[in-house]
Amino acid sequence: MKINSHYTDLSTHYLFHDIDLRVNEYLAHHPGEHLLRMGVGDVTRPLPPVIVEAMCSAAEELEHEDTFRGYGPENGYEWLQQCIIDHDFKPRGIEFQPDEIFIGEGAGSDLGNLSELFASDNTVAIPDPTYPAYVDANMMAGRKIVLLPCLKENNFVPERPEEKVDIIYLCFPNNPTGAVLTHEQLRLWVDYARNNHSIIIFDAAYEAYISSPDTPHSIYEIEGAKEVAVEVHSFSKSAGFTSVRCGYTVVPYDTGLQAMWMRRQCTKYNGTAYVSQRAAQATYTPEGRAAVNANVAYYMETAQMIRQGLQEAGLQVFGGINAPYIWCATPNGMGSWDFFDLLLNRCKTICTPGVGFGPSGEGYVRFSAFSHREDVLRALERIHTDLSL
């Protein structure tokens, strides 16, 4: 028996596991201390009543023989696929067939599993810093990875690689930097992919947070993108589905990958829970849209509080305008983990070290607007009074 040796190339611990180790060590020496958590990007607001009601109604259907449902379609129920098309794409002049919309358990799974469609000798371009799963999934397959630095000097927008790459990961609005692309910037990436016969995996998990008019909500707003792009969406950060688990991935026929992804899902995925899909459908009702918009507005209000509070404390910040993340430069050239430790020990506040997202994240930390509002206000007060920059 031989194991996949590429797993030995992975970091021993996942970023958030390393954070937990440091936090637990701190708490072991300071039992009972209340820490203010502004790091991990899990949501904190409860599910809107309209979504809970839809889930309860769906669960009650399963109690009765005449409405009971077993396995559903591997790629999702057509009523949800059509709902997504009608609300997320048609208003932007984008047309899809239901079979091009694949309902899944969330963006994270599909972003990792999509790599199974591609040979291991492909070259993959990934922005740096980035969501760690992009790198890990491709390291597991033994692919060559080209990192694209996202720096203050390029407004945290990666330059197109000079060499030909086969697979490109893009996430906008970006996690962790909060950066966004204009239509023109995204068009250049689509043109690159078309000219080089590449595929773009576009992570649109934070699309609901876009407010700027020149920021595209979907890569398919760009002409020709259906030929070269797969787009991944999530209900987690907009509707609070981090425990409900539901998202969707668009695999256009024109990419040549739709049949492959369908075959993969039929073999390895038995479909998303009926109750979760009814919950997702409820987000598109008028009451559901209002609830989602209220969630987004609440978190973005928190983001503005964080931006303003950090700036008043003398820190330089980016993002937090079209995304729920604030990318904060560490003071005086301090390392990411050093600043993490300083905030933990002096302000009892937890952030996310930027270097955990990649080498170009060194010298930054990430703050999350998904944090509890009370924790945010107390943390900002402590940073302002106790940090002494």
Regions found by a protein language model. Name each.
Residues 222-300, 304-308, 386-387:
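Conserved core segment of the aminotransferase class I/II
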Residues 281, 296-307, 317-329, 361:
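Conserved glycine-rich beta-strand-loop-beta hairpin in the small C-terminal domain of fold type I
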Residues 126, 147, 202, 351-353:
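Hydrophobic residues in well-ordered beta-strands that form the structural core
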Residues 66-193, 208-212, 216-222:
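Conserved core of the PLP fold type I
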Residues 30, 141, 195-196, 313, ...:
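Helix C-cap/helix->beta junction micro-motif
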Residues 2, 6-105, 283-286, 389:
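N-terminal small-domain helix-loop-helix segment of the aminotransferase-like
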Residues 86, 90, 125, 333, ...:
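PLP-dependent enzyme catalytic core of the Aspartate aminotransferase-like
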